[in-house]
Amino acid sequence: MSGIRHIHGLGEFPRIFHRLMCESESIYLNANEHSRADVVVESREARFVADVVRRYPLHNYQRLARLLHRLRVVKAAAEIELVKRACAITQAGFERVAKFVKPGVHEYEVEAELAHEFIRNRGDFAYVPIIASGKNACALHYIANDQQCRAGDLLLLDIAASYANYNSDLTRTIPVSGKFSKRQRQVYDAVLRILRAQIKGLIPGKRWDQWQKEAEQSVEHELLGLELLTPRDIKRQDPEKPALKKYFMHGVGHPLGLDVHDVGLLKEPFAPGWVMTVEPGIYLPEEGFAVRLENDVLITENGTVDLMADIPVEADEIEELMSR
């Protein structure tokens, strides 16, 4: 099934490795590099690299990470199918908790419902879930999940499953009482418009920084419409600290795969086979809520494929789902 024709026991590794080293000149070694990782202890890979260089000091050693990152960011068909399966498990979990949530439920109860649904589908949490009601949603990585959901609040769910080591990444924001207030709906629809625009903007040849700038322009436009910013605010802002950053302070998306924040060469243009998250948000601590929405998107030569297109995201869809 794997295509691997010869399998050796671990006990044979030293002998085979020594023979290969004696016949080789250039050696590529991995150092488990990740832009989001700050490794403070010596890893197993680091110990292996140090031992190899000590034993074979005259070889030409090269860095493997950049090659691996380029390979990992472009997904093969089999990898895409695994991400799709993770997305399907995530959908089952989200639809379950959307029907479960009501005033008085605790955030940890929502987490428990998700754990049951993910595990019964042979999945697991892709990351520690963020189940943030009310003002908790204004903390980007709130994971206490210990508060009671109150009537009238919004509940931000940054929840997703992994399957066979491949991850999905979903965010939805739902009304605890089952209906959005007028103000909540205004902000929700604004974020949804940004999500739609940024999904369309994921095209081969575009770079991440350009895509991020487009997202910030969309956010700025929506903030003006919500009367959270004024034209005067825009005119007087420091270009290094744009006014919109008060309400949207993070990246609009990242590569997805074996890691939730997968390795990728974000200084290089998007290409077919990349899977990206798209996750705009507007955060309003003064009003006691935040809205973030997130889907996973495959970039192809002919446009984008929303891998979460079947997961309810329109406000009316959310309300209908919660009423069942």
Segments (PLM) and residue ranges:
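Active-site neighborhoods and metal-handling regions in enzymes and metal-associated proteins
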Residues: 1-324
